[in-house]
């Protein structure tokens, strides 16, 4: 019989040290029996115990970040291309069946598994789907 439940979680950290909030949240995922893989482009020195590392360039080349710029706004906001890149990354990750996407700042309160035959997403406000959680 095919197993339809999973605890596999994937997420992304572009570069630099992991912020305290993200460290706490990643540790909460591990503490609640999630199989966490953190995709990265540069070495990470403060990884929580139990989090696995994977090469993010196997999912999406970082050079795409240089091509993502805001077209409508005259002012340059360096966070916009990063957010857009992250959106592309998580969608491609889903296409490659790498598990439930959780942003690094999602805190887990209790253990769970998810059904591989269902779709999951986050509802953010009136009529808007958010991307902190997606499968």
Q: Which residues make up each language-model segment?
A:
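Active-site-adjacent helix/loop patches that line small-molecule binding or acyl-intermediate pockets
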Residues: 34-42, 131-134
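Residues that flank catalytic or metal-binding motifs in active/ligand-binding sites
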Residues: 5, 32, 49, 129-130
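Hydrophobic targeting segments
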Residues: 5-11, 29, 36-38
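Active-site-proximal specificity loops/subdomain of glycosyltransferases
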Residues: 44-88
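Short, well-formed alpha-helical segments that are part of the catalytic scaffolds
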Residues: 17-31
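N-proximal low-complexity "stem/linker" segments adjacent to membrane-targeting elements
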Residues: 1-20
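Short, polar loop motifs at secondary-structure junctions
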Residues: 39-45, 107-111
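GT-A fold catalytic core of metal-dependent nucleotide-sugar glycosyltransferases
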Residues: 81-129, 134-135
């Amino acid at each position: 019989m095919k197993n339809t439940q999973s605890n596999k979680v994937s997420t992304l950290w572009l570069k630099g040290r992991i912020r305290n909030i993200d460290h706490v949240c990643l540790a909460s995922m591990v503490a609640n029996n999630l199989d966490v893989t953190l995709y990265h482009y540069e070495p990470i020195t403060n990884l929580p115990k139990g989090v696995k590392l994977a090469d993010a360039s196997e999912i999406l080349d970082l050079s795409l970040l240089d091509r993502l710029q805001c077209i409508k706004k005259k002012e340059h906001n360096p966070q916009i291309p990063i957010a857009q890149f992250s959106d592309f990354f998580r969608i491609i990750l889903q296409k490659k069946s790498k598990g439930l996407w959780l942003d690094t700042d999602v805190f887990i309160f209790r253990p769970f598994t998810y059904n591989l035959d269902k779709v999951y997403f986050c509802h953010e406000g009136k009529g808007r789907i958010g991307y902190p959680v997606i499968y």
